[in-house]
Swiss-Prot record:
GO terms for molecular function: DNA-directed RNA polymerase activity; zinc ion binding. Its main location: host cell. It comes from Psittacid herpesvirus 1 (isolate Amazon parrot/-/97-0001/1997). This is DNA primase. InterPro entries: HSV_PRIM. The lineage of its organism: Viruses, Duplodnaviria, Heunggongvirae, Peploviricota, Herviviricetes. Belongs to the herpesviridae DNA primase family.
Length: 1293
């Protein structure tokens, strides 16, 4: 209990040092009542605690100031010796002497008494400056005549409660020089400036150092020697011998507050002179022990005892107070701390008395102050070692030299300082001949430490300079990397997943093992100074980041483009077979049906006309790719019942290749009149959309007829002129035809094949009919002054164009239940790898931050899209190097998804209705045929022809609002008009809540085309990179963008569909929302704005496979766009060396001189090796030799083992092992015993062994012994490899 409370005492002491009290105790008038002076006081202990706290505040705040503390303890008036004697607990005739001694002590301390004759209380007004005892005194502390009153031999010891003692001591515990003496602080500040040389010494003893040190303070030598653990020079060493040497001896500290954790505490101070100084210097140089008698002779008693004054007074006061209160006639309520403390004798006598009566408890108190738990040098070696640098230089700096504010490494922990010392030059051989591993006694440790080259004052100074330089270098390194990473963090504008990857890779680049080792090696060469921090930007990683910040440089270094040049005639044929050509914009030829009707049509065509034309396309249209694992014949499962109205091909025989075999076409009919088709069964039939695209995009021409022609027209025998019509149209339609997916209400979908359509009369009529171009300023057809002016003109034209779009009217936004009508509300082009990419539609979705940040204005959006256009045109000029691209005139067509709450229609917003409208811009092809067949809204071909006219088309003669700001006359000049446009654009805000969707259609310039969707995907990824590098785009939308990954590259996959401009998507309530409408972004030098606006309605500008008029037959086909692995790309390559498992086993055996037993099989294959010969002649002898050497106890089991159940795989041979011999044949168990453990009982002999011969990662053949043990500790029959041996023709390793 006592020890715990003393610990509390030290903790509170440290807190008081870190946070000094600032309040002053007010003076209490003499008339104050007892209740006021001692509120809620019930015992003398409480009163002592209260007074002790006042005294602590006095000691803390009394330095250099006048402080008044009122003591409310009852004291006798001056001169009342009897009362004083009673209070002192002394009944001897010498009371008068003690009273006089008290008065002299009070006078020496500056105490003045003021007695109150009307009361038994008296007030002591302390108005003295700092007492000499509160700091390091130069003279005697107290009169030597003062005697500590102790009990006689027969008296009973009287102690107050341990808790009260500890709390009182905690209040009194103030280290007057704690700041100067703690943590290797500046002791020189507390010493006279006249000293020539001063050092700090950390010491140890063979016995318990705390007890030895207390006796040493009292002039007693329990042990003969002290050992130097470390020493540090405070001042420069003396140039001549015999000079004054002042040494402060330290022990490890045990306590300290969080702000200033003390590592060592001073114990005593010595002033060595003459021969004693020379002996001490010699002992420090050679590591000899210090003689305790010499230390006692040179002990500075006043200085040393002052280091412990607070603790000695606290212990003495409490003990004395307890004795006085217990004395006969003593009143425990009339005790005063100041009075009791003033009765104490000198510090040495007080300490001697305490040690005489209460040695155990005094030692316990000092144990809380000093950590002397180490009993051997191994403690220091384990903490600071094992290298000599850390054991000498680090130990001295960390314990004796470091302070929190030294500007070097004072705030570092021990491991941090040791890490810094790694690059410090290693010292030479220790003069003592000892090593850290041989330090068994403190004498050896002292000799090792002092004889080190790092122990001298020059080495100490050099190490401190090194630490300072190294910390500065490391700090520069870290700060440079952090600033560099922070710079790119804001410059790259990466998507979320790439941003996380960038942060990890950037810090890994700066702090990986190789980088840190390079930095440390340079610091080692340059004495702690490393200049690589400023040049880290030259590494490959940061070079790659800089390249990513410049699109031309990034493209030149990281993008490879493969181009195929076609002759003109081949290019024309390629364009005919791989593109739609120019899509007609008048008339109608096509259909829009649900998947069930589409399947019927395809089945009908495949069973009839295609087979009659003698083509193998029919089976490819209906069969899914065969499963490689299916070993059955297709003839047994190929029959599918197909309802057919008539047999257009007659009963003639034909052959169709099914699964690689030619089969005679079935000419029999089932009992219900249906015909058995050679096609596959329904389980193997491809999905309707895949079959539809295969027909629509097919480049085969059986008998000169495209399969899409057969798809568009029914080959019904009842039509007498069907064949003629087919041939006539086939000659006209000799190109692929667009295939569309149409989203229906309720989650259904239909499919459409439309060769020509009335785009101007049905699709875009509501947007462009009656469009009146704004009356722009005279220079509006030329370049404008700024991007903001151009964006304002773009917005004015966009508002004028979309004034009458049906998307702004709720009455015209209801989805149709009939496919042909819904075809004009929602249409998604199905993508295919069979088509060349002539226009690249980009799906741009900008995810927005929460609505609290606001929404961008239309002026901001137009400015952002203009920067997007600049990025795309720049990329196009790099990607299509041979094309003539004018950045000021090249067309890029923008379409924006209508806002969620368009035209103020609250019900149009899915978020406001509580309905989650899905994103139907991009969708997969149908994957569940049953869902489509459940939709009952399909209709016949006749019904389709009746619904082709859209009844909701607006009247072309409808007038446009003449009050539109864009149509106002420009009489006031162009500047005023543009300012009005900017004001109007800035006042209109986008009302999209989650994201802003754009469709950007970019024509491929003449004479280029992209070969397939993989090239389109790579190109779109480059567009993403180009956009984020546009500073204007980032500046405009950075505060709104939640994720910088907005270009969807995953849409370019076969079977996926992309919504076309001018079409909307259907939400869960059957309402059409989010229609893609033109968002005009004029080129800087647009020659004709009206013509440019009209081009947005041309389907040849936004269909992927539509050939434009200016590029009908591309001659340069980009076959691949490869982006080299940039610095942020994930490394998908296998780590380490490529495994040689793919290497041929026979080749590996031949390489080491093992000749196969036969030459059968394919050369280089495992089959070319005689497995039995290899196992019995090569593998088993090698395994037996290894077992004999390492498992001799099991050698007998494997000596007669034989191989069984040999299995030959590609690259390896496996075989089971059986125990041979007569025992095996007689029925004895053939299993083996465990090689790892000695099992008992049923698990004793349950191991199944096998051998494997394969090729390792170095390409060498090896044999491995694998076992399965049924014991639980062996994994319960888990396959384990026990060992491997490398096979060789000469010997087995």
């Amino acid at each position: 209990m006592f020890g715990f409370l003393i610990g509390v005492f030290f903790d509170r002491r440290e807190e008081s040092k870190c946070e000094p009290l600032v309040k002053h105790a007010p003076a209490i008038e003499p008339e104050a009542s007892e209740a006021e002076n001692y509120p809620l006081s019930s015992s003398a202990d409480d009163k002592i605690l209260a007074e002790a706290l006042d005294a602590v505040e006095t000691t803390i705040l009394g330095s250099g100031s006048c402080l008044h503390v009122t003591d409310t303890a009852a004291m006798p008036p001056a001169g009342d010796s009897a009362a004083a004697a009673v209070m002192m607990g002394s009944h001897s005739p010498g009371d008068r002497l003690m009273i006089e001694a008290l008065e002299s002590v009070e006078a020496s301390r500056g105490l003045t008494h003021s007695a109150d004759t009307c009361s038994q209380r008296c007030s002591i007004a302390l108005s003295a400056p700092q007492s000499p005892q509160s700091r390091v005194p130069e003279g005697p502390i107290m009169d030597s005549g003062q005697i500590f009153a102790v009990s006689g031999a027969g008296e009973e010891e009287n102690w107050i409660d341990d808790e009260d003692m500890a709390l009182c001591a905690a209040d009194l515990q103030i280290d007057p020089i704690g700041d100067a003496q703690s943590v290797g602080g500046s002791t020189a500040a507390c010493l006279p400036p006249s000293q020539k040389e001063e050092i700090r010494i950390l010491y140890a003893t063979d016995g318990y150092p705390v007890v030895c040190s207390l006796h040493l303070l009292l002039g007693q030598a329990l042990l003969q020697e002290l050992y130097v653990i470390a020493y540090s020079h405070v001042t420069e060493p003396s140039a001549h011998g015999g000079g004054l040497l002042r040494a402060t001896f330290y022990l490890l500290a045990a306590t300290g507050c969080e702000r200033q954790r003390q590592r060592v505490r001073p114990v005593f101070v010595c002033s060595f002179t003459g021969e004693a100084a020379d002996k001490t210097r010699e002992a420090l140089r050679e590591g000899k022990p210090l003689m305790v008698q010499d230390v006692i002779a040179s002990l500075d008693e006043a200085q040393s005892l002052a280091l412990h004054e607070d603790l000695i007074i606290a212990l003495g006061t409490i003990c004395s107070a307890g004795k006085t209160a217990a004395a006969p006639g003593g009143d425990e309520r009339n005790l005063s701390y100041n009075y009791v403390a003033s009765t104490l004798p000198g510090l040495r006598r007080t300490l001697a008395s305490l040690m005489l009566q209460y040695e155990t408890r005094v030692v316990a108190a000092f144990r809380r102050k000093y950590n002397a738990s180490f009993s051997c040098p191994f403690w220091f070696v384990s903490k600071f070692g094992p290298s000599e640098t850390s054991l000498v230089a680090v130990l001295r700096y960390y314990l004796l030299g470091a302070t929190q504010d030294d500007g070097i490494a004072g705030s570092f922990d021990l491991q941090g300082v040791k890490d810094l010392a790694v690059t410090f030059p290693k010292p030479g051989a220790n003069a003592s001949g000892l090593t850290a591993a041989r330090l068994n006694t403190f004498a050896e440790f002292s000799r090792f430490w002092c004889c080190s080259e790092l122990a001298g004052p020059k080495a100490e100074k050099l190490f401190r300079e090194y630490l300072k330089t190294r910390v500065s270098s490391d700090t520069l390194y870290v700060q440079s990397l952090d600033s560099l990473i922070e710079k790119y963090r804001h410059a790259l504008r990466l998507p979320a997943k790439d941003f996380v990857r960038f942060v990890y890779l950037a810090y890994h680049e700066g702090y990986n093992r190789a980088a840190v080792e390079a930095h440390m090696e340079e610091a080692l060469r340059n004495g702690g100074r490393a200049e690589t921090a400023a040049t880290r930007a030259q590494s490959e990683f940061f070079k790659g980041l800089r390249e990513m910040c410049s699109m031309p440089e990034y493209f030149a270094r990281n993008v490879d483009v493969a181009v195929k040049r076609l002759p003109v005639r081949v290019a024309e044929e390629h364009a005919r077979l791989r593109s739609y050509g120019e899509i007609p914009r008048s008339g109608f030829w096509g259909f829009c049906w649900p998947s069930y009707d589409v399947s019927l049509r395809i089945n009908k065509i495949c069973a009839g006309p295609l087979c009659c034309l003698g083509t193998q396309l029919a089976d490819a249209m209906v069969r899914a790719p065969p499963d490689d694992g299916d070993k059955g014949t297709c003839a047994e499962t190929a029959a599918t019942i197909i309802h057919h109205d008539s047999d257009a091909s007659g009963e003639e025989e034909a052959t169709v290749k099914v699964c690689g075999a030619h089969m005679p076409r079935a000419n029999k009919r089932a009992g219900d009149g249906t015909r058995i088709s050679p096609a596959c069964n329904e389980a193997d039939t491809r999905a309707p959309l895949a079959r539809l695209t295969a027909l629509a995009y097919s480049d085969q021409r059986p008998r000169g007829i495209m399969p899409v022609t057969l798809l568009l027209y029914s080959l019904d025998d009842t039509s007498s002129g069907a064949d003629t019509a087919v041939k006539s149209e086939a000659k006209a339609q000799d190109r692929p035809v667009p295939v569309y997916r149409v989203a229906m209400p309720g989650g259904g979908q239909a499919f459409a094949v439309v060769a020509r359509d009335q785009w101007d009369k049905t699709v875009t009529v509501d947007v462009f009919s009656g469009f009146m171009a704004p009356k722009s300023p005279p220079e509006s057809n030329g370049p404008l002054g700024s991007d903001k002016d151009a964006a304002a003109v773009d917005d004015a034209w966009t508002r004028a164009l979309l004034a009458r779009a049906w998307g702004t009217s709720y009455a015209r936004r209801c989805a149709a239940n009939v496919g042909a009508s819904q075809l004009y509300l929602n249409r998604n082009e199905v993508l295919s790898d069979s088509l060349a990419v002539c226009n690249l539609p980009l799906d741009l979705d900008i995810t927005l931050k929460p609505s609290s940040v606001g929404r961008p204005s239309m002026l901001t959006l137009h400015m952002a899209m203009r920067s997007v256009r600049e990025a795309i045109v720049l990329l196009w000029s790099l990607l299509f190097a041979d094309a003539e691209i004018d950045p000021d005139t090249y067309p890029v067509y923008f379409y924006k998804t209508q806002c969620d709450a368009a035209a103020g229609d609250e019900e149009a917003s899915p978020q406001r209705r509580g309905v989650g409208g899905g994103d139907d811009d991009v969708a997969w092809g149908e994957e569940d045929v049953e869902i489509e067949e459940m939709w009952g809204g399909y209709y016949s071909q006749t019904a389709m022809n009746d619904d082709m006219i859209w009844d909701d088309a607006p009247d072309p003669q409808m007038d446009i609002d003449s009050d539109h700001p864009a149509h106002e006359p420009m009489d006031d000049g162009a500047g005023a008009a543009i300012e009005e446009m900017k004001t109007a654009a800035a006042a209109r805000f986008c009302r999209c809540e989650r994201k802003i969707g754009f469709r950007i259609c970019v024509p491929i310039p003449k004479p280029y085309a992209l070969a397939g969707l993989s090239v389109a995907k790579a190109t779109s990824a480059l567009v993403q990179q180009a956009i984020v590098l546009q500073e204007k785009f980032v500046e405009a939308l950075d505060q709104f963008i939640a994720d910088y990954e907005f270009v969807d590259s995953g849409v370019y996959s076969a079977g996926r569909s992309l919504r076309l401009p001018f079409f909307a998507k259907v939400n869960a309530r059957g309402v059409m929302v989010g229609r893609l409408l033109p968002f005009l972004v004029f080129p800087p030098k647009c020659r004709d704005r009206s013509e440019f606006v009209a081009q947005h309605a041309d389907p040849n500008n936004f269909h992927v496979g539509a050939a434009r008029r200016d590029n009908p037959a591309p001659t340069l086909i980009i076959t691949s766009v490869t982006v080299r692995r940039d610095v942020l790309a994930q490394d998908n390559r296998a780590h380490g060396k490529p495994r040689a498992g793919t290497a041929r086993l026979a080749d590996a055996l031949a390489a080491v001189g093992i000749v196969p037993g036969n030459q059968q099989g394919t050369p280089g294959d495992a089959c070319a090796v005689d497995a039995s010969w290899l196992l019995d002649s090569v593998a088993m002898p090698a395994l037996r030799e290894y077992i004999d050497e390492h498992f001799p106890r099991h050698a007998a089991e494997y000596r007669d083992a034989r191989t069984d159940c040999i299995r030959v795989y590609e690259g390896r041979i496996c075989a089971a092992l059986r125990r041979g011999g007569a025992g095996y044949m007689s029925g004895r168990r053939s299993n083996f015993t465990c090689l790892k453990y000695q099992h008992r009982g049923a698990s004793m002999q349950t191991v199944i062994a096998s051998v494997v011969v394969a090729v390792n990662s170095q390409g060498l053949p090896y044999a491995a012994l694998q076992t399965r043990c049924f014991a639980t500790k062996c994994g319960s029959n888990e396959l384990q490899t026990q060992f491997t041996v490398t096979l060789s023709a000469t010997k087995d390793v």
